[in-house]
């Protein structure tokens, strides 16, 4: 299964956010094992650096968060065409619209997020991490990538 990982889920793992870390850690284990191919947008990397630096007050830890993301994830390019599709999409949040446009451009199976409200009119299925597990556990999806 090829999925775009929303920034909030990625930060749950990188910053070990207590309420959400266990699901995020399981997701990263599935990525490491090849059961899931994780994607992030190029713009997510700048968000990760900024938020991790603000949260940890450490440039080195922010750099480590970006490095871990670059190691584990495929990067969806954000070019003019993606930005224009996102802008004309009608989604209220431009950042979320960029993620949807990237997922469409890459032909991804789903977007994983804790903020499904931001993706209400997405043409790509929007799932929580737990919903993703349920799909993977379905008999006909035992290991589709």
Describe the function of each predicted region.
Residues 1-40, 54-60, 121, 127-145:
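Short, well-structured N-terminal submotif of metal-dependent ribonuclease cores
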Residues 9, 47-51, 85:
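A general alpha-helix detector
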Residues 25, 47-74:
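Active-site-proximal, substrate-binding regions of enzyme catalytic domains
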Residues 40-44, 82:
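Short, conserved alpha-helical segments within structured domains
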Residues 44, 65, 116, 132:
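Residue-level "edge-of-site" marker
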Residues 46, 85, 118-119, 134:
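Positions that flank functional sites
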Residues 71, 107, 122-123:
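Short, structured coil segments at secondary-structure junctions
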Residues 74-116, 143-145:
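Active-site neighborhoods of divalent-metal-dependent phosphate/nucleic-acid chemistry enzymes
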